[in-house]
Curated annotation (Swiss-Prot):
The lineage of its organism: Bacteria, Pseudomonadati, Myxococcota, Myxococcia, Myxococcales. It comes from the Bacteria. This is Aspartyl/glutamyl-tRNA(Asn/Gln) amidotransferase subunit C. Coiled coil: none annotated. The keyword Ligase applies. Keywords: ATP-binding, Ligase, Nucleotide-binding, Protein biosynthesis. Belongs to the GatC family. Heterotrimer of A, B and C subunits.
């Protein structure tokens, strides 16, 4: 599936990426190749293949949760570029 330059620009806008014209051309080619690979996978007959949730049969070994004292807010915010009361302040990204 060949993507158009406009489609790549639209995806870049949605991802809030600013691309140079060279990057737009490169991503048009690369994303088209990825979509071609996905189309190939979609055309495979996998009816006889049993579903798997994990590639290996090992189970996760998790440690027990143990509560312990945390850092005081002053110490954890000591190197923060911006803070609001006892929280990190970050730029708003959703309009």
């Amino acid at each position: 599936m060949a993507l158009t330059l406009e489609q790549v620009r639209h995806v870049a806008t949605l991802a809030r990426l600013s691309l140079t014209p060279e990057e737009e051309q490169r991503f048009t080619t690369q994303l088209s190749a990825v979509l071609d690979a996905v189309e190939q996978l979609q055309s495979l007959d996998v009816e006889a293949v049993e579903p798997t949730s994990h590639a290996t049969l090992t189970s996760s070994r998790l440690r027990e949760d143990v509560t312990r004292p945390s850092l005081p807010p002053e110490k954890s915010l000591a190197n923060a570029p911006a803070k609001s009361d006892t929280s990190f302040a970050v730029p708003k990204i959703i309009e």
